[in-house]
From Swiss-Prot:
InterPro entries given in the database record: FliE
UniProt-recorded name of the protein: Flagellar hook-basal body complex protein FliE
Signal peptide start and end residues: none
Keywords: Bacterial flagellum
UniProt record similarity statement: Belongs to the FliE family.
UniProt keyword annotation of Cell inner membrane present: no
Broad class of where this protein is predominantly found: other
Any GO molecular function: cytoskeletal motor activity
Organism from which the protein derives: Pectobacterium carotovorum subsp. carotovorum (strain PC1)
Pfam families reported for this sequence: FliE
Location within or outside the cell: Bacterial flagellum basal body
Length: 104
């Protein structure tokens, strides 16, 4: 299990440990930011949809080892992840509109 907030703290602790030992520190070339996190989330939604689509296609073609319950679970996971993505987008648009409507 991975907690996203802990990764940054863990990285800082590792940097401090390297500084204390006198080892030169290699800086990461790209720091994770909002855009990279958003892209990763969209890619994950896309992968989930592709997996569900592939499973459904295999079941339709009668490939052995592909059960209907697995296909239905994958399709539901895909649907839920897409709905979550849409809700996140709606919240982002709403927050953007709120900021744009603020008086300066």
């Amino acid at each position: 299990m991975s907690v996203q907030g802990i990764d940054g703290v863990l990285q800082q602790m590792q940097v401090k440990a390297l500084q204390a030992s006198g080892t030169p520190i290699a800086r990461p070339s790209v720091e994770p930011g909002f855009a990279s996190e958003l892209k990763a989330a969209i890619d994950k939604i896309s992968d989930t949809q592709q997996t569900a689509r592939t499973q459904a296609e295999k079941f339709t073609l009668g490939v052995p080892g592909v059960a209907l319950n697995d296909v239905m679970v994958d399709l539901q996971k895909s649907s839920i992840s897409m709905q979550m993505g849409i809700q996140v987008r709606n919240k982002l648009v709403s927050a953007y509109q709120e900021v744009m409507n603020m008086s300066v």
